[in-house]
Amino acid sequence: MVTYSMIPQISQAPGLIQRVLTFLETLKAQGFTGDTATSYADRLSLSTDNSIYQLLPDAVLFPRSTADVALIARLAGEAAFSSLVFTPRGGGTGTNGQSLNQGIIVDMSRHMNRILEINTEQRWVRVEAGVVKDQLNAYLKPFGFFFSPELSTSNRATLGGMINTDASGQGSLVYGKTSDHVLGLRAVLLGGDILDTRPVPTALAENLAQTPTPEGRIYQQVLTRCREHRELILEKFPKLNRFLTGYDLRHVFSDDMQTFDLTRLLCGAEGTLAFISEARLDITPLPKVRRVVNIKYDAFDSALRNAPLMVEAQALSVETVDSKVLNLAREDIVWHSVRELITAIPDKEMLGLNIVEFAGDDAGQIDRQITQLCARLDTLMTQQQGGVIGYQLCDDLDGIERIYNMRKKAVGLLGNAKGRAKPIPFVEDTAVPPEHLADYIVEFRALLDSHGLSYGMFGHVDAGVLHVRPALDMCDPHQEMMMKQISDEVVALTARYGGLLWGEHGKGFRAQYSPAFFGETLFNELRRIKAAFDPHNRLNPGKICTPFDSEAAMMQVDATKRGSYDRQIPLQVRETWRGALECNGNGLCFNFDARSPMCPSMKITRNRIHSPKGRATLTREWLRLLAEQGADPVMLEKKLPESSLSLRALISRMRNTWYANKGEYDFSHEVKEAMSGCLACKACSTQCPIKIDVPAFRSRFLQLYHTRYLRPLSDHLVAGVESYAPLMAKAPGVFNFFLKQPWATSFSKTHIGMVDLPLLSSPTLKQQLSGHPAMNMTLEQLEALSETQRAQKVLVVQDPFTSFYEAKLVHDFIRLIEKLGYQPVLLPFSPNGKAQHVKGFLQRFARTASKTADFLNRVAKLGMPMVGIDPATVLCYRDEYHQMLGEARGDFNVLLVHEWLHQALQEREVQVTSGEAWYLFAHCTEVTALPGTPGQWQAIFSRFGAKLENINVGCCGMAGTYGHESQNLENSLGIYALSWHPQLQKLPRQRCLATGFSCRSQVKRVEGNGMRHPLQALLELI
């Protein structure tokens, strides 16, 4: 390794092909209204999906309409660009690399997300390809409908992606696959022709086949080939609920051959035939009644073998989860929401779970079905048969949704397994006849056990589909080879049971096994159909099949994987930067719902770079490129000088910064741009199934980045807020006067990069508490108190935001403590260091944290509760202090207001609720780290006879100083408008309460008047 005093410049990145650049320039000149992206960061962010593969595209296009897509296809048809290839992409949730390729990626998800038309009488809806599945269902719900094909990634998977993989999931035994609900498609052929598909009489299809157009050529080829080989198709295609797609030759014709539909061919085609831009979808009435029975087993095999009983009971769906997934769920935040719905059985170990749903419009019939099932289960338990150890009923819609959210998170939870080997997708969606599933799984498990692998299992046993993810370390070349060996063995095993390798998630890189399933004759028919649509193999080449007479190669299962890049990073670096390296691409951070706290920067920009997955992807590549140059970031971190910057280092940074401002390339700048967009809200550290803590590795990156480049002045001001705020508070009138001057605000915005700075409290906290006993106790006096005297004390831990900018709130808290019969003591202000951590001043943060931890540990020995008001700073003591100090942090505990109140009011009886309700807007960092927060606040208010409703919102957009930085102002206000503003417009402002200082500041800035803290409402109630 080379010894560095700063990170090296990473000046080389994979270059751009001139023909690609010319194509993009011509496209713009011809009126393309979408976005184009060619930076290395942009290309990297779309080089992976939820699979193990990695392929770097040459460029990315984000069309805004079908017209844009047609323009792309038309220009691509010109001879000058005949060498370019194109791949459509949706939500990027594919598990087998379906949308990964070189060439140009056409991403439909960013802009093409409009719901265009609905007809409730005829029960259909027309959408663009980028609409997310849950987005559509949220739109349909007020009409009483839903789009029934289900999948675990429904909050970020696009309908275009679902169509291209013919996705299905829970409930498919009743609802079928996506293709069963697609009434018609608008597709764009390479060359720019529009193809509108729908079921048509075969006679009309034959007439269309005679037209001298690309559409006619397609109709001619498909009609001829599918009719000629009809008997072979019916013989070869398994008669499974999860029928064979890509290409679905069987369903192009109706059973009586009187109807013909190209739609069925495009469904499951993975973008290899055309660009799908719009779809007309069948919609299903929402069932009036839903019931779930959670059945618990002593073994996973028992759960599998008991599944036919559920199918006989006419259940809508049967979802099975094994003990590995259950144990991972128990360690995740999601378990908080379901633990009362899936309780433990005394003296029994739950090693399997069947989630059985009944749904329909006849409540009486469903109740009878459940009663009969429960009677069977009781008999099995009495006779100690079938491995049934207990069951629970749930008829609450919210509870049912929480159960399925846990099940949906199972995929990601497996990625959070401990150790270097991680459960990965490559044989995860095999389908066999349901009656053979249990025996098949016995052999499957024996196969994996023979390789000494651990694995997790869950899935849709009613449909014969079980998701199996063997744990492999893909940084180990030997285990990478084992992955291919296991794939081959599972292909053979599945064939023996009359099943499919691809029962649910599409083929992707696994299409190399297609000839074995289809046979040579039918596989060649697939190739002829590919040739009719895409004769020169330019649409997602290498997937499904290659055109007939083409010598082009198929993608291979053992193609380039993420692990082959990650293994180039030294092991020590991989271990210490685990947060970035362990992202498995599950994409939960792409959740479309504005009320979901993760990830606000992704929600407002719709740019994958500005997501936890994007930032993790860029960081792992940055670490790899550092390793290429012999730079060890771990060693560099250890050698950072403790003292101030030397003159030589300062001059070097000034020179590097000057060249950077002149446009000198460094990949580190692209990573820095991604990190600068992060709000450091920490939602990812709890909401992500893998617990990818972006703020943690972001602060490390910033520290290293600024060994080479100067920091902006605003960074120093933010990091020093806890030093200068106490000094400014000595003369708030003077500083507030200057802060209000137009020239000062203009100077701050233009030269410092800060806007809308808050005013200092006047009168100050010290003035408001002048003469109050809370101000007059020293630590020594506290230590001298007797046990009886200490029992009445409550110690208030100050933070810089409420103490110096919201002093009245601190004063009100002290008054509340007194009214509850306790004696408040305001501890001396001791810097928290949160702002230093956010900006990557980690050495300063370590010193601050060490000093404050020593102080708080000394106070903690007194045995009196310590309580802080601002969630972000209090939680910093629990999280960042642990990360930085380890065991040296000690065991002090600072409670949040609601935590202390919840304890202090345990003996107080709940009073009869009366009066108008209050509305709680909880701080996003607080509610993700402590999901019980809203419920505890509600319990507290109930003890004073007040009703408190929790308002489900995402981030407010302020996030400490993020919203005060000029470069973030537009996004900050945009994030606020996503969920906070609409909710506040519906509610009486004076009854709305917010726990976060940042949240209250943002509301005041945008709405003109602020919100109060819940404790201030309690003060009013007492």
Swiss-Prot record:
[4Fe-4S] cluster binds at residues 678, 681, 684, 688. Keywords: 4Fe-4S, FAD, Flavoprotein, Iron, Iron-sulfur, Metal-binding, Oxidoreductase. It catalyses: (R)-2-hydroxyglutarate + A = 2-oxoglutarate + AH2. It comes from the Bacteria. Optimum pH is 7.5. InterPro entries: 4Fe4S_Fe-S-bd, 4Fe4S_Fe_S_CS, FAD-bd_oxidored_4_C, FAD-bd_PCMH, FAD-bd_PCMH-like_sf, FAD-bd_PCMH_sub2, FAD-linked_Oxase-like_C, Oxid_FAD_bind_N. Disruption phenotype: Disruption of this gene leads to the significant accumulation of D-2-HGA, and thus impairs D-2-HGA utilization. The keyword Thylakoid does not apply. Optimum temperature is 45 degrees Celsius. Residues 53-286 form the FAD-binding PCMH-type domain. Pfam families: FAD-oxidase_C, FAD_binding_4, Fer4_8. The keyword Amino-acid biosynthesis does not apply. Its EC number is 1.1.99.39. Gene3D superfamilies: 3.30.465.10, 3.30.70.2740, Vanillyl-alcohol Oxidase, Chain A, domain 4. Residues 667-700 form the 4Fe-4S ferredoxin-type domain. Its cofactor is [4Fe-4S] cluster; FAD. GO terms for biological process: lactate catabolic process. One of its GO terms (molecular function) is D-lactate dehydrogenase (cytochrome) activity. In the N-terminal section; belongs to the FAD-binding oxidoreductase/transferase type 4 family. Catalyzes the oxidation of D-2-hydroxyglutarate (D-2-HGA) to 2-oxoglutarate. Appears to be the only D2HGDH in P.ananatis, providing the way to recycle D-2-HGA produced during L-serine synthesis by SerA, by converting it back to 2-oxoglutarate. Is involved in the utilization of D-2-HGA, that can support the growth of P.ananatis as a sole carbon source, although it barely serves as a good substrate. The physiological molecule that functions as the primary electron acceptor during D-2-HGA oxidation by YdiJ in P.ananatis is unknown. This is D-2-hydroxyglutarate dehydrogenase. The gene is ydiJ.
